């Protein structure tokens, strides 16, 4: 299960933080590190501060975009303070660990950490199913990157051990599979295109409407089959003659022959 947990660092600017993160991960049994557009590449300082976790650094996956790091994941949790202009479903660290451990038994899970100074952007946070806030001392809440990783990695490990060491097998109601992040992004693109064509939103400025719709569907968290129904509804609207239809490659063409 732990191999399905991805620790994703976005635009890290200090190699020492990469090394300290690798150390924090390995102590909790996590090895899957993703670096999104790092401002510097891992170097000797990263290896030194990894303190024996150089294999985590050496095997890190370096990608250009957050979308690449999230590809194939069924659950994405982003670290954030609570004060955001657009509220989002929040988790406490313990609940984050429990949910991550449960879903990682079936599909990859990403825990996303932002830049050292400014964290994650609103656009990046909207790609997450949940946000997690670490309840630090409000008078001094300064956690460095590796500390934050250590806290969430610990919660994942505790939840993992609880599931492994339960006296009796954990019996849970069988859940239908959730769509992967890639499928959700295709749905949001499809939804925005259809709503633009119907005039419900302005194509040049989808802005707040799409943000609120993302929040709605994130909160509802539709299953894969339910998402297929929604896609089918959008396709049905597109089939009306006055709306362009999309080809397999996403290009648009008029529905009239």
UniProtKB/Swiss-Prot annotation:
This is tRNA (cytidine/uridine-2'-O-)-methyltransferase TrmJ. NCBIfam families: PRK15114.1, rRNA_methyl_1. It catalyses: cytidine(32) in tRNA + S-adenosyl-L-methionine = 2'-O-methylcytidine(32) in tRNA + S-adenosyl-L-homocysteine + H(+); uridine(32) in tRNA + S-adenosyl-L-methionine = 2'-O-methyluridine(32) in tRNA + S-adenosyl-L-homocysteine + H(+). One of its GO terms (biological process) is tRNA nucleoside ribose methylation. The gene is trmJ. Catalyzes the formation of 2'O-methylated cytidine (Cm32) or 2'O-methylated uridine (Um32) at position 32 in tRNA. It is found in: Cytoplasm. InterPro entries: Alpha/beta_knot_MTases (IPR029028), RNA_MeTrfase_TrmJ/LasT (IPR004384), SpoU_MeTrfase (IPR001537), tRNA_m1G_MTases_N (IPR029026). Belongs to the class IV-like SAM-binding methyltransferase superfamily. RNA methyltransferase TrmH family. Keywords: Cytoplasm, Methyltransferase, S-adenosyl-L-methionine, Transferase, tRNA processing. Its EC number is 2.1.1.200. One of its GO terms (molecular function) is tRNA (cytidine(32)/uridine(32)-2'-O)-methyltransferase activity. Homodimer. S-adenosyl-L-methionine binds at residues 79-81, 114, 134, 141-143. One of its GO terms (cellular component) is cytosol.
């Amino acid at each position: 299960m732990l191999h399905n947990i991805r620790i994703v660092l976005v635009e890290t600017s200090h190699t020492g933080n990469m090394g300290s993160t690798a150390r924090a991960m390995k102590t909790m049994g996590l090895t899957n590190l993703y670096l999104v557009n790092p401002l510097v590449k891992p170097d000797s300082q990263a290896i030194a501060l990894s303190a024996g976790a150089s294999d985590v650094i050496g095997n890190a996956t370096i990608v250009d975009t957050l979308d690449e790091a999230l590809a194939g994941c069924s659950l994405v949790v982003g670290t954030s303070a609570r004060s955001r202009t657009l509220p989002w479903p929040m988790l406490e660290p313990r609940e984050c660990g429990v949910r991550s451990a449960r879903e990682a038994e079936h599909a990859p899970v990403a825990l996303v950490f932002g830049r050292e100074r400014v964290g994650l952007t609103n656009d990046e946070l909207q790609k997450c199913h949940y946000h997690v806030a670490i309840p630090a001392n409000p008078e001094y809440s300064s956690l460095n990157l590796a500390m934050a990783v250590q806290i969430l990695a610990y919660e994942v490990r505790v939840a993992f051990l609880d599931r492994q060491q339960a006296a009796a097998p954990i019996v849970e109601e069988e859940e239908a599979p959730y769509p992967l992040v890639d499928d959700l992004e295709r749905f949001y693109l499809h939804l925005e295109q259809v709503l633009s064509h119907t005039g419900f939103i302005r194509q040049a400025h989808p802005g707040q409407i799409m943000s609120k719709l993302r929040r709605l569907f994130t909160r509802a968290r539709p299953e894969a089959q339910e998402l297929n129904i929604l896609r089918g509804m959008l396709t049905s609207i597109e089939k009306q003659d006055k709306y362009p239809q999309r080809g397999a490659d996403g290009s648009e063409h008029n529905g009239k022959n």
